[in-house]
Amino acid sequence: MPESTAPALSLEQAARGGGMMRRLVLRELALLDQGRLRLFLPEGGHIAFGSPAAGGPGAMIQVKDENAFRRIVLSADIGLTEGYIEGEWDSPDLAAVIGFFLENIERTPNVSGSGRKALALGALRIADRIGHLLRSNDRATARRNIAEHYDLSNDFFRLFLDPSMMYSSARWNGHTATLEEAQREKNEALCRHLRLGPSDHLLEIGTGWGGFALHAVSTRGCRVTSLTISPAQRDLAVERIRAAGLSDRIEVRLEDFRDHRGSYDKCVSIEMMEALGHRYLPAFCSAVGRLLKPNGLAAFQYITCPDARYEQFRKGVDFIQKHIFPGSLLLSVNRVNALMTEKGGFQLHALDDFGPDYARTLDAWAQAFEANLAGVRALGFDERFIRKWRLYLRYCEAAFAHRNIGVVQALYTRPNNPALNPPCSPAA
């Protein structure tokens, strides 16, 4: 990274050293007045943006290639992230960089979640939007979307997840010192919401690698039928269930929830609903209503965007949707509640919001990822992949830390439900 002795430049001086693309980007950056960002230029020198009163070093970007400015002009925030992936800029603290732009989201044009538009930036975002729409989650496309992320390699995910292989936010409290303990607490919280007991048959929509099913059966003695459309996840989940001696209590089915038939006491889904997109969330809520018994309970953990910004998120596309989770969309709590009522007669009974816990979870994953880069390379992943995943983890960490997005556990019930008794205790 640049030396602290690099001379400070005025906006005019910094613009003079580059072409039109640089000038356009610097002009937009000059409008951002929250936090602090120092931009170091390829020819030397730096320019500061944000508030002079902001404490600490703030965020820092070292531009290595003038093409970084061109990407930003053409693709706005997606161009910024793609420039990092291609090595055109670097930073010692990616979360701080993303955090700077989130602090200024109302003044940052043409980004997901922002209502501000600027004709000078984002000329190619329409192409990104069309590409995103083409990844809508019908049955065939849903399998392809899931495979692109979750079927990368089970060994890859082992490198940075804890032993439970939970790839969702943990819940941290005064009793959770490690990521594994915090993931156990997340699972416990869902079990408590569901009042799970030995007589329950639980439907899980989205198996992951079997971590929640293993926890639920080993602590509550229930039965679990778990649905997944990822062959790689299914294979490892079945292997882990067999090793735990619980194959008689847990069935993992390679099946789309829309095709499943059955009748269940309880339903759980952990960070799967975001993958559905706007169009297919109603089908999920209808399926839950169809598959749950009249006195059934449903507990979901899902990632949220602010209700007031949902339409902006829905009509946009960001780095995560283009490069990490194609076809996905963060959820509005209000919309989920309305659809659960409309499609299944449910009402929201309890809601826990723990967004900062996800920032801490992502930081733990990012640290483990960096500590195991040799293992990532040994699996055949190149430096571009490493930079993309490094950015993904820190990008999401910043979004949760700045409360731009959140994560909730929500319990849904139908009215007059006697199943809402005190939470069950873990099995002895």
State each model region's role.
Residues 1-183, 189:
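Feature captures hydrophobic
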Residues 198-206:
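Conserved class I S-adenosyl-L-methionine
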Residues 209-220:
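Conserved SAM-binding loop of SAM-dependent methyltransferases across substrates and taxa
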Residues 223-228:
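Conserved SAM-binding motif I beta-strand of class I
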Residues 258-267:
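A short acidic, Gly/Pro-enriched loop at the edge of an enzyme's catalytic core
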Residues 282-294:
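A short glycine-rich, Lys/Arg-flanked "PGG" loop and its adjoining helix->strand segment in the class I
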Residues 295-303:
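Conserved beta-strand signature within the Rossmann-like core of class I S-adenosyl-L-methionine
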Residues 303-420, 426-428:
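Substrate-binding/catalytic lobe of Class I Rossmann-like enzymes that use SAM or dcSAM, i.e.
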